[in-house]
Amino acid sequence: LDWIRKPEEPAGAAGRPLTLLSGQRLTLGQFSRDKAVLVYFWGSWCGVCRYQSPIIDDLAADGVPVVGVAVRSGSSAEVAAYMAKRGLGFPTVNDEDGGLARSWRIVATPAVVLVKNGKMVHYTTGISSYWGLRARIFQADVFG
């Protein structure tokens, strides 16, 4: 089903500033210059995301560059409270109205997009294992 749900990198995505819940601003172009970045589209309302998010958090804790995108999950305070309650610490952008996800043509969550040097090099939807994602990240770093 991934080929049906394939996201599309929006024009200018590499240079578009993103603001994390922490207030830090970054661009995917800068953040993905040296290593592939895992961009994780998820929602607090998404049942499958409740299983995927701890895996993403483990990857981030192990040094994988991660940017979460909380899609239509409430205010920034609500997203931060949701993450704190579940012990999730990966950097996250609040996509309160879903506009960022729409610009990437994300039609299902959870969705993982790997970005290297500002370009999308891999994507998948649904649940993925820690080691499955690690393998994709390695592949993106070496061949991306």
Give residue spans per PLM region:
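N-terminal targeting signals for export/organelle localization
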Residues: L1-P17, G144
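Short, small/polar residue-rich loop motifs at catalytic or cofactor-binding pockets
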Residues: G12, K35, V107-T109
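Hydrophobic beta-strand positions
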Residues: P17-L18, L114
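Short active-site neighborhood of thiol/selenol oxidoreductases, capturing the structured segment around
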Residues: T27-R50, I56
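Hydrophobic beta-strand anchors of alpha/beta hydrolase catalytic cores
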Residues: L38-V39, V66, V112
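Structural microenvironment flanking redox-active thiols in thiol-disulfide oxidoreductases
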Residues: R50-R86, E96-R102
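Thiol/disulfide oxidoreductase modules built on the thioredoxin-like
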Residues: A84-G89, E96-G144
